[in-house]
């Protein structure tokens, strides 16, 4: 198998509140990925807050091992020499970033020590700019295999207002809030705003998936689509419960990640880096805490984690 292209599509604060997990949050692009790839019903983040979780899925390490124990813009740092771009770069990959990662202080562009070969210009993590920017990149993708990280700010507060011509506002009467929050007019309106925001996020993913098809890259591209942690609501994000740690995770591509499979065994976002290395033929660094999920998907093992 030739080295596949690898794309991480990650959203802020979405939890599992997307269509394939049985929630009435229309996300047809993520649903399409689930029907064509593999849906992980018990995927969890390594931390219930942004920077620690993101550092974990970019290094394959737990937060206490990569050093990111708090938010990057509040002074916390990770060991960027452990960032997956270095591992894949050594294996011959071109690496690109579009949108946000939130592992460095907020500023325009990526900090040089992040190690990306190319930063795709966009308006931060706004879906309206990330979708077209990534699509344009894919049309002229490099000849060598590439790793692309595309991060969206959508489903992070403050929820932007609905766009009636594109994403109509949701009727709050039919938008029950997530557990364990009370069902009130205020929480219903909040959930309606979240759902409108999720539509914007999903539309961005749809643009990128369509661009992969149009450029002829889809067949040899591993697409990993997921959220960093739970919803940015009380008793959800920042809590070490399923409400804070449970995330959607869908993977499509070569290596057995196809056919609309559903996996119920527990997996973690720290497993994404070793999985990428496994398919890329790259050495999995000794510091990685996660394990490749390819053997699980292909039925070679029954489980990956005991704790």
State what each model feature region is.
Residues 1-307:
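Formylglycine-dependent sulfatase
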